[in-house]
Amino acid sequence: MAADAHAALAATRNIGIMAHIDAGKTTTTERILFYTGVNYKIGEVHEGGATMDWMEQEQERGITITSAATTCSWRDHTINIIDTPGHVDFTVEVERSLRVLDGAVAVFDAVAGVEPQSETVWKQADRYDVPRIAFVNKMDRVGAEFHRCVDMMVDRLDATPAVIQLPWGVEADFRGVIDLIRMKGLLWHTEDKGASFETVDIPTDHAEAAQEWREKLVETVAENDDELMELYLEGVEPTEEQLMAALRRATVASKINPVLCGSAFKNKGVQPMLDAVVDFLPSPTDIGSVTGHSVGKEDTEVVRRADEDEPFSALAFKIMSDPYVGKLTYIRVYSGRITSGTAVLNSTKDRKERIGRILQMHANHREDRDGVGAGQIVAVVGLKNTTTGDTLCDPNSPVILESMIFPAPVIDVAIEPKTKADQQKLGTAIQRLTEEDPTFQVRTDEETGQTVIAGMGELHLEVFVDRMRREYGVEANVGKPQVAYRETIRRKVEKVDYTHKKQTGGSGQYARVIIDLEPSGGDGGGYEFENKVTGGRIPREFIPSVDAGCQEAMEFGVLAGYPLVDVKVTLRDGQFHEVDSSELAFKIAGSMAFKDAARKADPVILEPMMSVEVTTPEDHMGDVIGDLNSRRGQIQAMDERGGSRIVKALVPLSEMFGYVGDLRSKTSGRASYSMQFDSYAEVPQNVAKDIIAKARGE
């Protein structure tokens, strides 16, 4: 790779800004764009003017729904920022952006500390091993406690925080930060929106604390970096350069998390945080190579280095419809280089694609690029068959990169177009919106003929319906949200024998199968099929048909017609007829044998359980707990945080509809809650009876 291309790659940072809803992520991103000169005016979230929140729904609700990708530069480095949503209904956005990032900034609220969605996002980042720095925001707010936030990072996230700044003043007196690496104070000026700050000596009343925390910092880094440990053991005080280098090594290795603080809204502390992104977070060259597998051979590993001389490989991580250029596919290039007009292979689907325009995206405007190389994040136009998670690569050297894991939807609503014209538009809208978001699922209810859309929560579906109306002009009636129940079995049944026979004029149909059915112990998505037929009792070409029949039968369970999950089918034996056996006959036999077996295997209904966290004043604690108990909730823990009480509980989703209104009225609007999917659990018998009766129309 040419030296200048390598230098450009080393000076690139692909980062995400992640946090709980309302911790100030989008505001922080807006400040970054302001200080890096991309924006000339600061956009405020509460005024609906933030650059990154460019969908109408986001500007109205003041939350970020889609990850907008923006490029800016700082200290001669290119920073690609992905602003991710903190609302739990949009976890898929976080999941897909973490997959393509090299590093992240976790933003915490200095008042609330580590909140539930912060934990979820942190765990997602752990899964992809994304190095992180932390920014404790809102230091100017009443109740801000920096050290409590750092302690919570240890207790709740199992993180190793390396505090590199202390707050100078707190709440209304928050003036700046104390830099523990350079041992200086940084003071911000308010007249130029915090664009400049001065470096001063540490004031005497902070000197002792600064010295104590500096020692802790060196100790923490030394414990996680061999080179610094040697100096530490020799009793040598590290130089600024040595400490910076050790901090970088330990952060890139995901051993520590440097912690900074500030107030993005008050324009304090953002520039040092940008410095930390450049100084401590990895470039694509630090990440090195990416591993995939050969097409059709999952056990054959293929490695691609982050180098423009390597064959081209990229991952499509987001699809968006743009009113001006049509379908945009956001890609992260891992190796090689492409120019517009290049033919590439979608190796996931084995389809050829042609790259049209290549666009560098700022939050709501774009610039055309002739070509793009390893390490970059861009949007391309012209890909017809590519969806989220697909690999694009050089047709002469195919590879499939690791994709993403998306959670199954937990809630669905029926949707009916108001007119015939809406019916046609609905099809287009659903196709485009499901392309954009893989956690939306659409099916047609066989009995009612209604279109049913499923998603991750009420807000998720609300935004979906809203976008259909605004962007595609679809007027539709939306039903009440329904819970996505599942069915499973509790015991093993053996040798369930089913023969499918049909004799009419001409050739008939004949297939006999004998199966075992048992629980597979998965967590909501499992299915296994094992073939133990010997001696050609069922010809090899009919085995996949039995498997397909079983899978088809799983879609509608035997109790209330909900999908059946977590089962293992073993095909033990069977019979065929020289003339009358066919793929269809064995598919029907497999399906009917499966249903028979499921009825005998003690079937039960499962419901989604939500992890709920309620923050309430002490005097409403009893009402909140009583209400959660009345909703079949199981109280898991109670905590105290900043004068409020925190109640954690597991509650069935079916009991949580309309909870926001009930909680408001019970606590005079003083309590708040967050909820996220936890697991599926068996429904109590009395509740199951009602569900079954309703499903059967009794």
UniProtKB/Swiss-Prot annotation:
Keyword terms of this UniProt record: Cytoplasm, Elongation factor, GTP-binding, Nucleotide-binding, Protein biosynthesis
Coiled coil region boundaries: none
Major localization class: cytoplasm
Protein location: Cytoplasm
Top-level division of the source organism's lineage: Bacteria
Gene Ontology biological process terms, A to Z: ribosome disassembly
Domain tr-type G: 10-285
GO molecular function, one term: translation elongation factor activity
Pfam families to which the protein is assigned, alphabetical: EF-G_D2 (PF22042), EFG_C (PF00679), EFG_III (PF14492), EFG_IV (PF03764), GTP_EFTU (PF00009)
Keyword GTP-binding among record annotations: yes
Residues annotated to bind GTP: 19-26, 83-87, 137-140
SUPFAM superfamilies: EF-G C-terminal domain-like, P-loop containing nucleoside triphosphate hydrolases, Ribosomal protein S5 domain 2-like, Translation proteins
Family statement: Belongs to the TRAFAC class translation factor GTPase superfamily. Classic translation factor GTPase family. EF-G/EF-2 subfamily.
Main function: Catalyzes the GTP-dependent ribosomal translocation step during translation elongation. During this step, the ribosome changes from the pre-translocational (PRE) to the post-translocational (POST) state as the newly formed A-site-bound peptidyl-tRNA and P-site-bound deacylated tRNA move to the P and E sites, respectively. Catalyzes the coordinated movement of the two tRNA molecules, the mRNA and conformational changes in the ribosome.
NCBIfam families according to UniProt: EF-G, PRK12740.1-3, PRK12740.1-5, small_GTP
Listed name of the protein: Elongation factor G
Organism, as annotated: Parafrankia sp. (strain EAN1pec)
